[in-house]
Regions:
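Catalytic domains of carbohydrate-active enzymes, especially glycoside hydrolases
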Residues: 48-63, 120-121
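Acidic-and-aromatic substrate-binding clefts and catalytic sites of carbohydrate-active enzymes
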Residues: 37-43, 63-74, 96-107, 132-141, ...
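Active-site acidic/histidine proton-transfer and metal-coordination neighborhood
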Residues: 11, 81, 85, 100-193, ...
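Conserved, mostly hydrophobic/aromatic
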Residues: 32, 52, 60, 82, ...
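Short, acidic/polar
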Residues: 40-51, 105-116, 207-211
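Acidic/histidine-rich catalytic cores of soluble enzymes
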Residues: 59-60, 155-242, 249
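N-terminal export signals
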Residues: 5-24
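C-terminal segment of N-terminal export signals and the immediately downstream linker at the start
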Residues: 21-51
């Protein structure tokens, strides 16, 4: 499906959706994926969080966890910085290659992660990426099994495991279904949710609303990332691209949406201006 068809189908879907969703969405806080301001994080985590709070965001989705540290800071230190800026961290992206790929993985490492995530008051531990060398049908099957195992342990911490898509998950697996569809069907719905990156779904020619309808309640997290006009399809400020956000947010109840995170990877102006424009558009035109 090309972008014009995607936009057209979304517009048709809007007519079929009730206005009930717009009342529902006003309950949501506005979050941001911290990776959006990664260059500022590299300069100063403190400054990055201050800039996010100043722009009006309520919570951040963390990234950068390694050896029990975020950018050289402990979970307790990050928690303190979040509190200083009146921010929450309901979710975090965690690159878990060892857990996903290592047949002899020591699950004690997972428990350390759960301890740190609990300290940060996470509700979700999100797996954001699979390496290109680990995307076969067998790889996805093993990853799905590991996600279920990890999620079973996370339940004791009142957390769920999530999986975040790019475009490759929409490729067909050996059984004729997409890898993402197989993952959704083969994970425990009581323990595992999915974070739909709206940009990557559109990039792959998918209609997000179709996925919400096929798997209601499973996409509790979203990445709200817009796609610029033109052939490069780069990300841009929310509201400046081709994605119909009003239509998508009207379907949030079907999706099961709990939290969404603004994200942007390419900039044509200073990043804090970008995130201010995005939240301004959402507050004025969508929420």
């Amino acid at each position: 499906m090309n972008r014009r068809a995607f936009i057209g189908q979304s517009a048709l879907a809007a007519a079929a959706l009730s206005m009930q969703g717009f009342a529902f969405q006003k309950q949501h806080q506005i979050g941001i994926q911290l990776y959006t301001v990664r260059d500022e994080v590299a300069k100063s985590v403190e400054g990055a969080l201050q800039g996010i709070a100043k722009a009006g965001y309520d919570h951040v989705e963390l990234y950068g966890y390694q050896d029990r540290l975020f950018f050289g800071k402990t979970a307790a230190q990050i928690k303190a910085l979040l509190k200083q800026n009146k921010l929450q961290a309901h979710s975090g992206h965690y690159l878990l290659q060892d857990m996903l790929y290592n047949k002899t993985y020591n699950w004690d490492s997972w428990k350390y992660l759960l301890d740190d995530a609990a300290l940060l008051q996470h509700q979700y531990i999100v797996i954001p990426w699979l390496d290109a060398a680990h995307r076969t049908g067998d790889d996805f099957k093993r990853v799905t099994e590991r996600i279920n195992e990890g999620a079973a342990l996370a339940k004791a911490y009142k957390m769920k495991v999530g999986y975040h898509n790019h475009d490759f998950e929409f490729q067909k697996a050996g059984n004729g279904k997409t890898f993402l569809e197989n993952m959704i069907r083969d994970t425990d719905p009581g323990l595992v949710d999915f974070e739909l990156d709206i940009y990557w779904a559109a990039y792959a020619g998918q209609d997000p609303i179709d996925w919400f309808r096929r798997f209601p309640g499973r996409f509790t997290l979203w990445h709200v990332k817009d796609m610029s006009q033109g052939p490069n399809k780069q990300s841009c400020e929310v509201g400046k691209g081709v994605i119909d956000w009003k239509t998508i947010f009207a379907a949030q109840k079907t999706s099961g949406l709990k939290y969404f995170f603004v994200e942007q990877e390419h900039y044509t102006q200073p990043v804090f201006n970008c995130i201010a424009d995005s939240i301004g558009y959402l507050k004025k035109e969508v929420l």
